[in-house]
Structures are given as structure tokens and as C-alpha cells.
Amino acid sequence: MTKTVYVLNGPNLNLLGTREPQVYGSQTLADVEQLCTAACARHGLALVFRQSNHEGALVDWIHEASRLHAAGQLAGVVLNAAAYTHTSVALLDAVKGTGVPVVELHISNVHARESFRHHSYLAGAARAVMCGFGVQGYALAIDGLAQW
């Protein structure tokens, strides 16, 4: 049975490649999806790759992933909640309430940036937190999920 990895991207990540390239790099979200597709293929995993600027959509997708988790068909979720990392109790409750294995991911090193980015509501509920590896962090997170 092939397990699935969900890669969920939050607000403004659709602007990758043009938004603050000195912070986030020049690769686009389509480039990130290709990177994730290749990483999943190396491990024989299926990929669901999504982006939304809306908090509720991210919550719904975590709930969707939890159904695969309950059926033993989920490797895990890579969650780049972007700004919602620092504000969303709803995402925290979704992760805690479903028990899905989550890797919290940030392209930049959030701890080297503005102080408001240093706090994560999600970190305590995530299995792992990755930041500062650029978009390559997505592939590293998938590699980690494949080992669990």
C-alpha cells in the first residue's frame, strides 16, 4: 500500500519567486511542487500538494489527511503555515485534535528574523520543526517522514 504525504502551504506562498527573493529565494511554488514530487518518488510515496491563503482550507486539509492517517495510509504532513504559524490556534487544534504526524516547515530561518516570527503555535504539536534550509527543506522534511 502506497502511503501519502500532504504538503500544505499557507498564505502568500503562491508568491514564491517574486516575494522577497532575498529571504525566500527565486524558486516558485511550482518548483517546490516538482521538488516534493521527486522526493516522494524516491521513497515510493504519493503526494498531495496544496496552497491556500485561507486558514479554514488548511484546517480542512489537515482533517482530510487525518482520515488517511486513521486508515494507515498517511506518511505525514509537511506544513508551511507561513504567517499562520504565529497566529493560528485553529491550526494548532487541528493538528492536536487529529494526531497526524506533522513537520512544521519554514523556508527562512524564522529565528533570525523579526521577533514576532520567533513564536510558533504549531511547534509543540509538530513531530519536527525545520527552518532555514530554503526550499530544499521540503525534500528534507519528506525524507524524514519516509523514515517514521
Curated annotation (Swiss-Prot):
HAMAP family: AroQ (MF_00169). The lineage of its organism: Bacteria, Pseudomonadati, Pseudomonadota, Betaproteobacteria, Burkholderiales. Its EC number is 4.2.1.10. PANTHER family: CATABOLIC 3-DEHYDROQUINASE (PTHR21272:SF3). Homododecamer. This is 3-dehydroquinate dehydratase. Transmembrane segments: none annotated. Belongs to the type-II 3-dehydroquinase family. InterPro entries: DHquinase_II, DHquinase_II_CS, DHquinase_II_sf. Catalyzes a trans-dehydration via an enolate intermediate. It comes from the Bacteria. Substrate binds at residues 80, 86, 93, 107-108, 117. Keywords: Amino-acid biosynthesis, Aromatic amino acid biosynthesis, Lyase. One of its GO terms (biological process) is quinate catabolic process. One of its GO terms (molecular function) is 3-dehydroquinate dehydratase activity. The record marks 19 as: Transition state stabilizer. Coiled coil: none annotated. It comes from Acidovorax ebreus (strain TPSY) (Diaphorobacter sp. (strain TPSY)). It is an enzyme of class 4 (lyase). SUPFAM superfamilies: Type II 3-dehydroquinate dehydratase (SSF52304). Pathway: Metabolic intermediate biosynthesis; chorismate biosynthesis; chorismate from D-erythrose 4-phosphate and phosphoenolpyruvate: step 3/7. It catalyses: 3-dehydroquinate = 3-dehydroshikimate + H2O. The active site is at 24 (proton acceptor), 106 (proton donor).
